[in-house]
A protein has these predicted regions:
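SIR2/sirtuin NAD+-dependent deacylase catalytic core
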Residues: 125-129, 135, 151-153
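Non-catalytic, usually N-terminal nucleic-acid engagement modules in DNA/RNA processing proteins
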Residues: 1-127
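Glycine-rich phosphate/ribose-binding loops and adjacent secondary-structure elements
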Residues: 137-153
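Short beta-strand/loop segments at the ligand-binding rim of alpha/beta enzyme cores
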Residues: 58-63, 132-140
């Protein structure tokens, strides 16, 4: 499956010389859209509105928690706010990434303790989320490179 992540270029030139928006091409081709809850919320909400008005649109919306972006800025993502947002748009979204924990601090080498703690924290978030969202089967658990494979069982 091909997934179009982010907003990308705003215009595309078709072979016949006409211009159209890249968003329109994605809609026509049915590309799944991966958009970050906080960083791309405007674009995400536009897609939600479009999907509600055009149920025939084959595009699958996938929502990322924005955990990595928040981590790079030294910020925290509020889990309950994310759940509240999920519950407002779950009717047109295909999947939601759980709110995962990135070990350590951006720009620093994480400790073995931080690396061990992060997947446990992520798993607790996942369990909390599936108890509090309207759509538990749409929540994707996240596994990071370097984490113990026991978290995949």
């Amino acid at each position: 499956m091909m997934v179009a992540a982010g907003t990308g270029p705003t215009n595309a030139l078709l072979p016949d010389g006409t211009k159209t928006s890249a968003k329109e091409i994605k809609k026509l081709l049915g590309y799944p859209q991966l958009l970050a809850w906080q960083n791309e919320q405007k674009e995400l909400l536009e897609w939600v509105e479009y999907k509600r008005k055009h149920s025939e649109c084959p595009c699958k919306l996938i929502v990322d928690s924005s955990a990595y972006s928040a981590w790079t800025r030294g910020l925290e993502v509020n889990l309950d706010e994310y759940i509240e947002f999920i519950n407002k748009i779950e009717d047109v979204v295909y999947w939601f990434a759980e709110l995962d924990k990135i070990p350590g601090k951006f720009g620093e080498i994480h400790t073995p303790e931080e690396l061990a703690e992060a997947p446990e924290f992520s798993w607790r978030n996942y369990l909390y989320m599936i108890e509090h969202v309207k759509c538990p089967k749409k929540i994707l658990p996240i596994f990071h490179q370097g984490e113990d494979f026991k978290y995949l069982r």
